[in-house]
Amino acid sequence: MATQNDIPNSTPEDLAKQVEIAEKHPDPPAMPSRLPDSLKTLEAKIDTSKITDEEVANVHRFQRACDYLAASLIFLSNGLYTGGDLEEKDIKTRLLGHWGTCPGLSIVYSHCNRIINKYDLNMLFVVGPGHGAPAILSALFLEDSLGPFYPRYQFTKEGLNNLINTFSLPGGFPSHVNAEVPGAIHEGGELGYALSVSYGAVLDRPDLIVTCVVGDGEAETGPTATSWHAHKFLDPAESGAVIPVLELNGYKISERTIYGCMDDSELLSLFSGFGYEVAIVNDTPDQNRVMAATMDWAVERIHDIQHRARVNREEIKPRWPMIILRTPKGKGCPKYLNGKFLEGTFRAHQVPLKLARTDTNQRNLLKDWLNSYNCQDFLDEHGLPTKGITEHLPPREKRMGQRHETYNSYLPLKVPDWKKYGVKKGETTSATSVVGQYLDELLVTNDSTLRIFSPDELESNKLDGALKHSYRTMQTDPELMAKRGRVTEVLSEHLCQGFMQGYTLTGRTAIFPSYEAFMTIVVSMLVQYSKFLKMGLETGWHGKFGSLNYVTSSTWARQEHNGFSHQSPRFITTMLSLKPGVSRVYFPPDANCFLATVARCMKSENTINLMVSSKNPQPAYLSVEEAEHHCKAGASVWKFASTDNGENPDVVIAGVGNEIMFEVVKAAEMLQNDIPELRVRVINVTDLMVLSSLHPHGMNPAEFDSLFTKDRHVHFNYHGYVMDLKALLFDRIQGTRVTMEGYREEGTTTTPFNMMMCNNTSRYHVARMALQHALHNPTVAVNCNMLCAKYAWKLEEIENYIMENKDDPPEIYAAPVFKNKTSTL
């Protein structure tokens, strides 16, 4: 136990010394904490005695070459610089890119190549600081991983010059890692997601290791903060492993990082508490020797943990290895510029010499910088790597830029027949409960290619049938450890999304169920993923992607008990804003349609699917066969609820959404009883995108007109925001003959039917709109005013009942009944 004597006291003299150091050093060490010195015993003990001088020289040579090319990508416009004066024309007119993180990335990449060779590893490289693309592209060129995908970047002088001259310019690679970069499974622009994506990638891939570099700026983000716990959902018996490397260079764009201001005791206690065994590699003259030994240690610790779980069948709570790598920000660039520190400060974050094209002094500094790498030691006269680099690269199929898992590993699911789970037409049941049983079989049938990730909401959304033959995956829970679970529940939507992305981008398929209102937490991650998906599909060399599958339940319509904060369909808006080619939005109206939709989504490729359904009991409007036909069409006339099967209607009422459609059907029932002379066509839209003229699922004009007529008024009762529906229908239907209601941002803690009333989506609102737009029918014209008044009074009566009884009238949820109806779809 630590004593008071173990805790250092900061005297005024100590503080003054720290200030003096800070003034003389570009990146002063962190001020000492008041933690016990004994915490430093938590640091892993690394043996460097087995690392040879040749190994150190090899990785250092690769780093120099990588840094030299990275700087060239940022600055040069006329190919590789091999000596002599630099002229203005040799410098790009626009200097773009980020140098600060590049040296750290080249260090880690070079050491990954070394351990791939030494241990015959299957390894991926995930880059959190994706703005370090110059280093990654340089490493990929040096290992000849660009040429196989891009002929213009072949392993030749011309290919290298093309890479340099076009970087971050039209026609070249962007300044951040993205789907166009071979080996990438992570969009590198927005920070925070690298670690969770890495852990998702190794699930169900027992022979895969991902080295994930997390920048110390990125480590400040919320998603990264929770991702440090991701290893706790990793079963070492069935999955691979991640080596997290915290690249601690001390600075963000313009100030110090939180982690850069933490001393060793603080870092060791923090990450040890997260469950890691931590090794710190400092910026010393012997850094490469220590880093080599540390990477060896990390791999051997991983293999030991996996052996104990797989061979010895031990149920263990492992401490996975983690590395903290300290490097000066922008290591290698000029130390000073205009009397201020450059190397080792935030000034080296992006382009250290911003005026290199027009300022002679800065151009000379750049020349000295490039010459400092002594490129003649590792590049030939054509700028290509010489002996000393090429022979130490991994075999081609093992190179991190050519791993098939990153671009050509999609494994289609085996999708069982959903019909055996279908419910009898007219039966009232929870659609999610039925689908939960189907998910169970899907997980059993695809026991290494399908997973569910949920923020502790599976049971709440009545999908717990998925757990019949599976378990949850938390390995630190003694009741769940080593159970080979397929369902990960962690109360972090960001972590669920990251897991799903990593799992999907390495060839598998995932499902993400959540409350409708809280799915918006991952909106930014979804948008970034959609960009990755779009660019990946446009490369021409990327294979198929598995689908991302979102299931939102506990919708606004039935979150009356939790209140306004739980009522939001905004995630739908985001889905509709994505590129039409990748986005799918489904509103299955009953259990059978939900089953058919899940089966369809499980077979889909290259898409992002959203399924919106209710967990509360609803009638099954359609038989199994009818549901199958309806879902294939995406929208259809519900003849059983329409007048004369929907022929020659006076008005069309359409529903989009589960609870919403119930109100449409009840409105049709009510109108049939109150004014049978009104000819109503009832339509359900289950695939929202069929309404769009721009979407691959969109109906052609003839199909649209046949369904919604050419001249009759159409009223939509819509689950989401009306503005979204208006955008879909903008060029489809004349504005004067369409009305629509949807969620109006009205809600509170109330009753389910009151939610419908306050958002104008109740059966009475639908019926009034139908009457008011069918006045060409003489009978309707005569009776419209009376019936509309009746429905208005009924709404007031129900509102009074709710306020008095704190519940909806019991008859509200009676299943609809239509007279003399035998027609089917």
From Swiss-Prot:
Gene Ontology CC annotation, any one: nucleus
The entry's keywords: Lyase, Thiamine pyrophosphate
Lyase in keyword set: yes
InterPro entries per record: THDP-binding (IPR029061), Transketo_C/PFOR_II (IPR009014), Xul5P/Fru6P_PKetolase (IPR005593), Xul5P/Fru6P_PKetolase_C (IPR018969), Xul5P/Fru6P_PKetolase_CS (IPR019790), Xul5P/Fru6P_PKetolase_N (IPR018970), Xul5P/Fru6P_PKetolase_ThDP_BS (IPR019789)
UniProt EC number: 4.1.2.-
Needed co-factor(s): thiamine diphosphate
Swiss-Prot/TrEMBL GO biological process terms: carbohydrate metabolic process
A Pfam family annotated for this UniProt entry: XFP
GO molecular function, one term: aldehyde-lyase activity
Signal sequence residues: none
TM helices/strands, residue ranges: none
Family stated for the protein in its record: Belongs to the XFP family.
PANTHER family: PHOSPHOKETOLASE-RELATED (PTHR31273:SF1)
Protein name, entry field: Probable phosphoketolase
Organism: Schizosaccharomyces pombe (strain 972 / ATCC 24843) (Fission yeast)
Taxonomic classification: Eukaryota, Fungi, Dikarya, Ascomycota, Taphrinomycotina
